[in-house]
From Swiss-Prot:
It comes from the Bacteria. Residues 369-453 form the KH-like domain. GTP 1 binds at residues 15-22, 62-66, 123-126. The lineage of its organism: Bacteria, Pseudomonadati, Campylobacterota, Epsilonproteobacteria, Campylobacterales. This is GTPase Der. CDD domains: EngA1, EngA2. GTP 2 binds at residues 203-210, 250-254, 314-317. Residues 9-171, 197-368 form the EngA-type G domain. Keywords: GTP-binding, Nucleotide-binding, Repeat, Ribosome biogenesis. GO terms for biological process: ribosome biogenesis. GO terms for molecular function: GTP binding; ribosome binding. It comes from Helicobacter pylori (strain ATCC 700392 / 26695) (Campylobacter pylori).
Length: 458
C-alpha cells in the first residue's frame, strides 16, 4: 500500500451488487462515469479515475458487485480482492434499507482481513428516521460507520473529511503549498500540457477487446470471460512506451440494434462518448469465424468520429481460413479502410502485442501530421496537371491554392473558383495522391473545397 504522500493515494469502493457503489463513485468524481441502474451487477469491470477531494488528488476505484450467486462471481471477486489489497483505503458499501445478510458480513470480514484500512459505508439512509436501520450493521464490528444517502447527498461531506484524515492528506497540502507554488511559477504553461494518445478499442461482443486491453497493459484490469457482453462501462488504462503515454479505452461490445436491451443501451451511449475523446480506434475482428455485417457497421464508427484506425485480427491461432483468403475478404468488405494497417494477433498468447503498440505511435504521428504549405501546393499542382479538373458545364474549374488548417485528423482546404464543381471521384484522386506522397497511414484525410470569399472569412 502507498505510504508516501508523493504517491497518489488509492481508494477502492467495494460491496455487493446494487448497494450504490457506482452512484457513490459518480458522486465523489462529480461526473457520471460508471453506469448506474436498478439492475444488480451493473458494474462488471474496475472503473478507475483520478479525482480531487477538497483539493487533494486521489485515485478512485469502482469495483463489480460481489454477489454469491452472480454469473462470473469468482472472477469478479478475485479482481475486487486484488483491488482491496492494493488500495490505501476501502469504502465497503452496504444497503441501509436491507437487513444485513450472512454473506455480506462474510465478504466484509474477508476484505477487512486483507486490508484493515476500511470504512463501513451504510448507504440509502435518506432521513433521520432511517438511521435506526443502520444499527443492524453493528454486527460488522466497526467502531465507527458512516450513514450516507448518495441520492440525497447526505453525509457525503463528513465521509470525505474522514477519508482525507485516514489518508493523512489534510496536513500534506499545508506542508507542500509553498513548494508547489514555486514549482508552478517556474514551469512554463506549455510544459503542463501532456500529450496522451487516446485509443478506443471497438468491436462486436466477445471478439476479445478486454483480452487485448489486458495484453496491452499487462494487467488483468478488464474482466475476461466467454460470456458475451462482460464489459459494460468503458474502462481506461494508461501505459508508457518510451516517453509517450497511451490511454486505452475498452468499450462495451456492440450487438445488433434489435438485441440491445436494458443497461446495454446506456453502455452503447458511453461507447460513443468514449470515441468522441479518442484519437485512434483499434477495430478488433474475430477471425475464428467469417466476418459479419455488424463488423462493417461498427467499423463505420471510426469514420463517423474521424479517428485513426488499426485493424486487429484476433484469434489468429484458430483462424477459420488461410491468410490469403482472410485478407482478400477483409479488403473486399472493408474497402473504405484500405489505408488502415492490419495486424494479426492472438491476445491470449500475446502474439504481436508490441507491434500493435508501436503501430499506434506510427499512426498517431500520421494523424498529427502537418504538411508545409509550399510542399502541399506543389503536390496538388502536379496532380491537377497530370489529370486536369473536369469542367463545369464547359466552364473552367481551377484550384487557386491549398492549405492545411487542422490536424488530428489532417484537414485541408482547396481554394477554388467553383468549389461545388469538385466531383467526389476527383476528390478521391487527390486524397489518394496525398496519401502516396505523405504517408497518412491509418489516418482519415479530410479535403474541403471553398471559394476565396469563404476562405477569407475563416
Amino acid at each position: 500500500m502507498n505510504t508516501s504522500h508523493k504517491t497518489l493515494k488509492t481508494i477502492a469502493i467495494l460491496g455487493q451488487p446494487n448497494v450504490g457503489k457506482s452512484s457513490l463513485f459518480n458522486r465523489l468524481a462529480r461526473e457520471r462515469i460508471a453506469i448506474t441502474s436498478d439492475f444488480a451487477g451493473t458494474t462488471r469491470d474496475i472503473n478507475k479515475r483520478k479525482i480531487a477531494l477538497n483539493g487533494h488528488e486521489v485515485e478512485l476505484l469502482d469495483t463489480g458487485g460481489m454477489a454469491k450467486d452472480a454469473l462470473l462471481s469468482k472472477e469478479i471477486k478475485a479482481l475486487n480482492l486484488k483491488a482491496a489489497q492494493m488500495s490505501d483505503l476501502i469504502l465497503y458499501v452496504v444497503d441501509g434499507k436491507s437487513i444485513p445478510s450472512d454473506e455480506d458480513l462474510k465478504l466484509f470480514r474477508e476484505v477487512f482481513k486483507i486490508n484493515p484500512n476500511c470504512f463501513l459505508v451504510i448507504n440509502k439512509i435518506d432521513n433521520d428516521k432511517e438511521k435506526e436501520r443502520a444499527y443492524a450493521f453493528s454486527s460488522f464490528g466497526m467502531p465507527k460507520s458512516f450513514n450516507i444517502s448518495v441520492s440525497h447527498n447526505r453525509g457525503i461531506s463528513a465521509l470525505i473529511d474522514a477519508v482525507l484524515s485516514a489518508l493523512d492528506l489534510n496536513q500534506i497540502i499545508e506542508q507542500d503549498l509553498d513548494a508547489d507554488i514555486l514549482e508552478s511559477l517556474e514551469t512554463p504553461n506549455n510544459a503542463l500540457e501532456e500529450e496522451i494518445i487516446q485509443v478506443g478499442i471497438i468491436g462486436r461482443v466477445n471478439v476479445g477487446k478486454s483480452s487485448l486491453l489486458n495484453a496491452l497493459t499487462k494487467k488483468e484490469r478488464s474482466l475476461v470471460s466467454s460470456v458475451a457482453g462482460t464489459t459494460i462501462d468503458p474502462i481506461d488504462e494508461t501505459i508508457l512506451i518510451g516517453d509517450q503515454k497511451i490511454c486505452f479505452v475498452d468499450t462495451a461490445g456492440i450487438r445488433h440494434r434489435g438485441k440491445i436491451l436494458g443497461i446495454e443501451k446506456y453502455a452503447l451511449e458511453r461507447t460513443q462518448k468514449a470515441l468522441e475523446k479518442s484519437h485512434i480506434a483499434l477495430l478488433v475482428l474475430d477471425v475464428s469465424a467469417p466476418f459479419v455485417e455488424l463488423d462493417e457497421k461498427i467499423s463505420s464508427l471510426a469514420d463517423k468520429h474521424s479517428l485513426g484506425i488499426i485493424l486487429v485480427l484476433n484469434k489468429w491461432d484458430i483462424r477459420y481460413a488461410p491468410y490469403e483468403e482472410i485478407i482478400a475478404t477483409l479488403k473486399r468488405k472493408f474497402r473504405f479502410l484500405e489505408y488502415a494497417p492490419v495486424i494479426t494477433t492472438s491476445c491470449l498468447k500475446a502474439r504481436h502485442i508490441d507491434e500493435i503498440k508501436h503501430k499506434i505511435i506510427e499512426v498517431y504521428e500520421c494523424f498529427s501530421k502537418r504538411i508545409p504549405t509550399s510542399l502541399l501546393n506543389s503536390v496538388i499542382n502536379q496532380a491537377t496537371q497530370k489529370h486536369p479538373l473536369p469542367s463545369d458545364g464547359g466552364k473552367l474549374v481551377k484550384v487557386y491554392y491549398a492549405t492545411q488548417f487542422a490536424t488530428k485528423p489532417p484537414q485541408i482546404s482547396l481554394i477554388m473558383n467553383r468549389p461545388k464543381a469538385l466531383h467526389f471521384s476527383y476528390k478521391r484522386y487527390l486524397i489518394n495522391t496525398l496519401r502516396k506522397e505523405f504517408n497518412f497511414l491509418g489516418t482519415p484525410l479530410i479535403l474541403n473545397a471553398k471559394d476565396k470569399k469563404s476562405a477569407q472569412q475563416n
